[in-house]
Amino acid sequence: MPVAPHELRDTIKSRDLGLFQCIDLLKQHNDNIGVHHQLVQKLYSYSYDELEFFIPQFIQLLVNFETDSMALEDFLLHYCNQFPHFSLIVFWYLQAFLFELRNEPKSYSFQTVRKFINKLQNILFNVETSFHIRGPEFRENMQPALILCGSVASAFSSPLVNEYALPIVRSQGKQQKSFVFKLASFQKSLTRNLTMKNQRLSADAITPVISDDDSKVSNRIQESQRLKTKYSKKKISAALQLDDSENYTTDEEELGYVQTLSRPKIREMKYTEVEENLKINTIIRSKKNRSKTTVNSISFFSDTDQSASMEEYNRSAQSLPELVRTRSRLDLYSSESEAALGTSRNSAELIISKKKFMGSEVKTRPYKELLKILQVNYSKKETSFIMSLQNISLRLSSVPKVARLSALRAELSIINESILPSEIDIPQLLPVTSNKNKKFHKILKLNINEACVLNSAERVPYLLLIEYLSDEIDFNPFSDQNQKIINDCVRKPEVKPNDQISGDDDTSVVSSIQEEMFLDNNASENYNEDGDLGEISLLHSRSSSRDWAKSTPGSPVARSSQEDEKFYGNVSSTTGGTIESSVLADQMRIASLMLQQLESSGQSNTQQFVSIRNRIIESMISLQDQFDFIDYETLKELKTDEQDAGKRKLENDFKLAEDWNEKKHRIRKSSIYGHLENWDLCSVIVKNGDDLPQEAFACQLISLISNIWKKHKVDFWTKRMKILITSANAGLVETITNAMSIHSIKKSLTELSIENGENAKGRIFTLKDYFQKLYGSVDSSKYVKAQENFAISLASYSIICYVLQIKDRHNGNIMLDHEGHIIHIDFGFLLSNSPGSVGFEAAPFKLTSEYVEVLGGLESKAYLKFVDTCKNCFKALRKEWGQIVSIVELMQKGSSLPCFNNGDNTSVLLQQRLQLHLSDEEIDSFIEVYLIEKSVGSMYTRLYDQFQMITQGIYS
């Protein structure tokens, strides 16, 4: 039913309009530009936390709901400019959409994602875009032009009309409606550029051959004059650019001139002489300039006066940026190169130059640009860190299971050495810090010993413990630490990808490694006839170079280590030497890569293959024991009971089952950063899988339902899980601490009782046995409290499972925490899909006789509490049914997620399950008879548990 315009206006202005109601109105009125703009203006009134929660819905509106309005895009770009966390989350979601739409390159959705993601790349990875390039503010659009003319004419009688019209005209005027003018101007500029390029080549070709001495002086003078002239012309022409395709030329000479002006006189003369010698009798450009052009799109400062056409060209480019993953060790090689060339200065000169340079960039650049440098530095390091974590999981999948833990530790050690500690945190998973008055966290290191590979049928997820400093970093360009970062970013030497040992080109890495193994005479003396990798000093030369760099006062490595020592304390005595750890990591990585090559050689049936494979695996296992060790004596002191933790860790769950506070205390005591006051620990799972976006959506729905219950003051309990999507099939999952799956509880208790001779018949332990073992007798206060927690959480998740049709509820996907709460995980099947497309789980939700036994029977107080909680939760959801149905209706359009297999019927069936036609009295009967009685001891539930026990070994 259409709403009257004045009613819609009052609704938008109302303070009671919730954020999701505003999003729903955006979906309904996406064809009305004026209403769309008013609704987007309303978005600015909501808090950052609310807006970040609904980022997937904003992206869905932008991509799958076609509209002529530019308001939502401008809003997202504005927030991406303002909040680094917001921009990264949007960027990763767009990458997932881009992968999903890869087979539809001509669709509206793909074109929208492509254009927006390229604009976002300029925000994330480009410093100069916002300050030196201004795109056209008004294009050839009829409608905004007419509105502009009309508002100017009506301003004489109604001056305030401009306040309403200006935002719409400004936003809609940037929209490109036709490519006719763009193509025409592009052809003109292309012809002009080719003509200029040919003239320049002709001039270089007919240059008379003169003596070297004369050419050095004359060419230097001519080049300087030419650059000055061109530099001034460029600045004038850039200011006159109106169309986005006017100029596609590069400004290498301009960049060279600017950099030359900033160099000391001696360095200027040396570089100019080298460059002039390269130009004699040739038209080939110097390698120095060519390398700068190659990395122009990802460097911090490229062509400072690049035209607006290059910005638009980058936006329309099909490819994503290749981020340069700079490593701290790479600064070492530049120092060695300067020493070899005789151009390095002594330590006294370095100290003087450092004092002169320190703060110069802060003084000469505007505040917004300094802020942008820090934000770009954060974005580059963050994306590089996340990509490194994702690549580990992919590489582990090609490594045999017995060697995966060794390979994982090697990979994590390399990340610790090359990236961390750094200005990096994890959006969403760590506490929210994107508010203006809060600082960001800073990741210090990945705990290698506590990392473990989790069991999975196809993928290789792994558990990661991350040490970080809470509220440690910000974007204040005037702090001492950030001034160092700014100066390092501006002075940072460009790095060739070949110098990175952790690069993606595994073949070249292994080739160079093998060459070093078999050609280095020093290394050949260190291994025996068997060629055990554990005894090969593969990186002796790099170890020596690290020693040299650390002993050289002026080297970057020495400076960084000295600064770290001042801030973090003297940690060398604790680590036992970072050089040995780095060599071990490199050796493990080498062995892992060689093992991957061996597996892909296609000779797995030969005896030689098996022999080599076994030797490599044995070497990796022997190497893994040489990493940082666990202090078991300290561990025993920290334990409050007499139970041996090693006996209980039968599976991965036991890695998670250790009390979180005890684990933090133990790790902090052994950490080199543990003495810092704001030290903290975070546990995440790095996971690859096609169902991760669906799991993230399920967690969002559960959080939305929990918010509804909280609003209506319902007694409920749910665990709010967080999943950070970093690509179409990868992400980080928050670890549930102090909890174990019911499968692991049953299996561990049963096997331990058999091992101790207490269970000769092999009876499987029940949940009640576990509760009594953990909380004491049935009448104890501790047991009663845990029983109540179990009842409330069981009721909450039961209603969620029914409403959202969450399936695959075997005991491996249901957990219990240390307080007795039940927690559901793994939401690969919900709304409209089920395991194997077979309706095994026909019961409304899982309510086994074992659960009833824990509650104390059908007449117990805890069971009645369970029934009442079910009723209250279901009634509250019916009152807010519009939110749940609308968000599913919004997300199902154009989605390829398996949970939307039913298409538009998905939201229809969801609404039907809420039984909106029944009264509250009828709902009580519906819950008791249809939901609970059909679920108690359901035959379908028992069959599914038995099926999982037989096929997957999951205890029922």
From Swiss-Prot:
Residues forming the PI3K/PI4K catalytic domain are 658-939
**GO cellular component terms given for this protein:** cytoplasm; membrane; nucleus; trans-Golgi network
Q: Give me the ranges of the annotated region Catalytic loop.
A: 805-813
What residue spans carry the region label Activation loop?
824-848
Q: What is its EC number?
A: 2.7.1.67
- Molecular function as annotated in GO: 1-phosphatidylinositol 4-kinase activity; ATP binding
Region span, Disordered: 545-573
> PROSITE patterns given for it?
PI3_4_KINASE_2, PI3_4_KINASE_3, PIK_HELICAL
Entries under InterPro entries matching the protein: ARM-type_fold, Kinase-like_dom_sf, Phosphatidylino_kinase_fungi, PI3/4_kinase_cat_dom, PI3/4_kinase_cat_sf, PI3/4_kinase_CS, PI3K_accessory_dom, PI3K_accessory_sf
Predominant subcellular localization, coarse grouping: nucleus
User: Which segments constitute the PIK helical domain?
Assistant: 1-120
The organism's superkingdom is given as Eukaryota
Instruction: Show the Gene3D superfamilies listed in the entry.
Output: 6.10.140.1260, Phosphatidylinositol 3-/4-kinase, catalytic domain (1.10.1070.11), Phosphatidylinositol 3-kinase Catalytic Subunit, Chain A, domain 4 (3.30.1010.10), Phosphatidylinositol 3-kinase, accessory domain (PIK) (1.25.40.70)
Per the record, which residues fall in region G-loop?
Answer: 664-670
Q: Which reaction does it catalyse?
A: a 1,2-diacyl-sn-glycero-3-phospho-(1D-myo-inositol) + ATP = a 1,2-diacyl-sn-glycero-3-phospho-(1D-myo-inositol 4-phosphate) + ADP + H(+)
Provide the coiled-coil residue spans: none
Which keywords does UniProt give here?
A: ATP-binding, Kinase, Nucleotide-binding, Nucleus, Transferase
The question of whether Nucleotide-binding is a record keyword is answered with yes
Q: Give its localization.
A: Nucleus
In UniProt terms, what function does this protein have?
Acts on phosphatidylinositol (PI) in the first committed step in the production of the second messenger inositol 1,4,5,-trisphosphate.
Anything else of interest in the record?
The C.albicans mating-type-like (MTL) locus contains, in addition to the genes for the regulatory proteins (MTLA1, MTLA2, MTLALPHA1 and MTLALPHA2), a and alpha idiomorphs of a phosphatidylinositol kinase (PIKA and PIKALPHA), a poly(A) polymerase (PAPA and PAPALPHA) and an oxysterol binding protein-like protein (OBPA and OBPALPHA).
Q: So what family is this one in?
A: Belongs to the PI3/PI4-kinase family. Type III PI4K subfamily.
Q: What is this protein called?
A: Phosphatidylinositol 4-kinase PIK1a
What gene is it encoded by?
PIKA
